[in-house]
Amino acid sequence: MLIIPAIDLKDGACVRLRQGRMEDSTVFSDDPVAMAAKWVDGGCRRLHLVDLNGAFEGQPVNGDVVTAIAKRYPNLPIQIGGGIRSLETIEHYIKAGVSYVIIGTKAVKDPEFVAQACRAFPGKVIVGLDAKDGFVATDGWAEVSTVQVIDLAKRFEADGVSAIVYTDIAKDGMMQGCNIPFTAALAAATRIPVIASGGIHNLGDIQALLNAKAPGIIGAITGRAIYEGTLDVAEAQALCDREQR
């Protein structure tokens, strides 16, 4: 299982939100490239980038920052989400050196787009499913649909999606532990690997994820915990490596 540091981009800065609310943000750095360097130096093996402005506006806003990070670390797998709603945007990011693009809102509103993206960019597409009470939320979490997470995940099994990033919005940024039962249930219900996200606070939460014994969970995204110092990236990754030998 990979420990994946999150870098959320808002107005060119590295921030963290609470429960997806743009008005409830904390700025942790005005230099996201330097922040990426910190996590790379700390031993991370993948980075999770989110263009928060892009998620709300429906197109990339902080793309220059994403490109700068990808160019600085050409051998590091990077995944980017937020505002990815066209094949042109995906192509732009792939050419910039990004390893994976995360399709969120567009995947819910136009599932066929995911199939198109997977055909055009095989192995490069991740679907981001963000949920409130088991129902998928869209448009920067501003809207909640009537679509259930597991039902939608199953629709993408035949498309060649590389992974699903599952976020429980109620947990995100609250550092009260992630929704392990539902994450494990999602991993068991689909053949697509799952990356857990939202609410990780400390090493105990990582251990709890490992204790779920869900082989389909291949990663855990962490944000506020590593920024506020309640979780150490290297220590968490070492725990995962020991447990999964």
UniProtKB/Swiss-Prot annotation:
It catalyses: 1-(5-phospho-beta-D-ribosyl)-5-[(5-phospho-beta-D-ribosylamino)methylideneamino]imidazole-4-carboxamide = 5-[(5-phospho-1-deoxy-D-ribulos-1-ylimino)methylamino]-1-(5-phospho-beta-D-ribosyl)imidazole-4-carboxamide. The keyword Isomerase applies. One of its GO terms (molecular function) is 1-(5-phosphoribosyl)-5-[(5-phosphoribosylamino)methylideneamino]imidazole-4-carboxamide isomerase activity. GO terms for cellular component: cytoplasm. The active site is at 8 (proton acceptor), 130 (proton donor). It holds the Pfam family His_biosynth. The keyword Cytoplasm applies. Its main location: cytoplasm. It is found in: Cytoplasm. Its EC number is 5.3.1.16. Keywords: Amino-acid biosynthesis, Cytoplasm, Histidine biosynthesis, Isomerase. Pathway: Amino-acid biosynthesis; L-histidine biosynthesis; L-histidine from 5-phospho-alpha-D-ribose 1-diphosphate: step 4/9. GO terms for biological process: L-histidine biosynthetic process; L-tryptophan biosynthetic process. Gene3D superfamilies: Aldolase class I. Belongs to the HisA/HisF family. PANTHER family: 1-(5-PHOSPHORIBOSYL)-5-[(5-PHOSPHORIBOSYLAMINO)METHYLIDENEAMINO] IMIDAZOLE-4-CARBOXAMIDE ISOMERASE (PTHR43090:SF2). This is 1-(5-phosphoribosyl)-5-[(5-phosphoribosylamino)methylideneamino] imidazole-4-carboxamide isomerase. It comes from Pseudomonas syringae pv. tomato (strain ATCC BAA-871 / DC3000).
